[in-house]
Design a protein with these regions (language model features):
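Bacterial N-terminal signal peptides
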Residues: 4-18
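Scaffold/interface architecture of coatomer-like assemblies
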Residues: 20-311
Length: 311
C-alpha cells in the first residue's frame, strides 16, 4: 500500500493544464482513447459489437479505429494491446454520513469483490480534508480494512476530492473509472463546481456518482441531482439516486454490469497539430438493425500541447 496523502482544502488549488497530458497514451504516437457504452431503449447494455460497427468522427472528419476492446481488459482485445483498468473509489466520510456509513461500506466492499480486473484501486475519503491512497490488485484486503476504519466527521470537500483524484489519475495510462458516493452537496472545497467541470472535461476519467439525497427538501434535491448528473455526463458516465440505502447493492451491480459491457475505442487523430485545442468527437453506430440505441461517451478532448506547434 502506498502512503496516504492528506490534503486540506487550501491545498486543492487545481488547474486544467496538468490534465491535458492524460488525453493520450504515450505509445510512440498519440493514441486517443474513448470509453463507450451502448444501451437499448430499456437502458440495458448492448454487447457483442465489433470495431466495424462503430464510426469515430473528430471535428467532422472520420477517424480510423486502431484500438478496440470490450469489457474486461484482462480478456484481451480485437485491436491493439490490452490497456489496464484503473479504478477509483471516492467515499463521503463527512459527519452527515454517521447513520449510513455501515450500509455504504458493505455495498462498496461487495462491489470490490466483484471487480477483480482492476490493475489498482485508488481510495479517496473526503470530509473536511481529502485523503487519497492507492492499492495494487494484490492489496485488496488492506484496501477493505482502510474502508472499514474511516469514521464520519467534519464538512464535505466533495469537489476537492474529485479534483485531487483527477490530478493523480493524470499519470496513469489506461482506462480510468471513478465511483463517487455522497449524501449531499459540497460544503468545504477550495474549487468551485465550474472549475471542477472544467477539470472533468479535460480528463479521460469516466465518472459514476451515487447520490443519496432523500434527506433534502424537494427543491434542494432537484438542484443537487442536476449538478451530479452534469458532472457525470461530462465524462460519459452516469449519476444514480437511490431512494433507500437498501437499493445500493442494486445500483453498484448496475454499474458493474455497465463496466463489463463498455467498449474501448482508440485512434490516432488525423489532426497532427499539438495546439492544446478542444476537439469534438462523435461516436456513431453502423448498425441499422439496432433501433432506439443510445451511445454514451465523453463529448471530446483537448489535443496535447507542444510549444511551437502551429494552430
Amino acid at each position: 500500500m502506498r502512503s496516504t496523502m492528506v490534503i486540506g482544502a487550501t491545498a486543492a488549488a487545481l488547474t486544467v493544464a496538468p490534465l491535458l497530458a492524460q488525453q493520450t497514451f504515450r505509445t510512440g504516437v498519440d493514441l486517443v482513447h474513448f470509453a463507450v457504452v451502448v444501451t437499448d431503449k430499456q437502458g440495458a447494455p448492448i454487447t457483442g459489437l465489433t470495431p466495424e460497427d462503430f464510426e469515430l468522427v473528430e471535428d467532422g472528419k472520420r477517424q480510423t479505429i486502431s484500438y478496440f476492446a470490450e469489457g474486461d481488459p484482462s480478456e484481451g482485445t480485437k485491436l491493439g494491446n490490452a490497456l489496464p483498468l484503473h479504478l477509483g473509489l471516492a467515499l463521503d466520510t463527512s459527519g452527515s454520513m454517521e447513520a449510513d456509513i455501515r450500509e455504504v461500506r458493505t455495498a462498496v466492499v461487495k462491489f470490490l469483490n466483484a471487480n477483480e480486473s482492476a490493475a489498482d484501486v485508488t481510495l479517496v475519503n473526503f470530509d473536511t480534508e481529502v485523503r487519497i491512497s492507492r492499492y495494487a490488485a494484490t492489496e485488496y484486503q488492506r484496501l477493505i480494512e482502510r474502508i472499514r476504519m474511516q469514521k464520519p466527521e467534519g464538512w464535505t470537500a466533495f469537489y476537492d476530492a474529485i479534483g485531487v483524484y483527477l490530478h493523480g489519475a493524470a499519470s496513469q495510462n489506461g482506462q480510468k473509472i471513478l465511483l463517487v458516493y455522497t449524501d449531499g452537496g459540497d460544503t468545504r472545497s477550495a474549487i468551485t463546481l465550474h472549475e471542477l467541470l472544467d477539470l472533468l472535461k479535460a480528463s479521460d476519467v469516466t465518472l459514476y456518482v451515487i447520490g443519496y439525497l432523500e434527506q433534502y427538501p424537494s427543491s434542494a434535491r432537484t438542484e443537487q441531482r442536476m449538478q451530479l448528473q452534469r458532472m457525470a455526463l461530462t465524462t460519459g458516465g452516469q449519476a444514480f439516486f437511490p431512494m433507500s440505502l437498501k437499493d445500493l447493492d442494486k445500483v453498484y451491480e448496475g454499474i458493474q454490469r455497465e463496466i463489463a459491457a463498455r467498449y474501448s475505442l482508440g485512434y490516432v487523430s488525423s489532426n497532427t497539430r499539438a495546439d492544446g485545442g478542444w476537439r469534438r468527437v462523435q461516436v456513431r453506430l453502423n448498425r441499422p438493425d439496432l433501433k432506439n440505441v443510445k451511445i454514451r461517451t465523453r463529448p471530446g478532448y483537448f489535443a496535447p500541447y507542444r510549444e511551437g506547434s502551429g494552430r
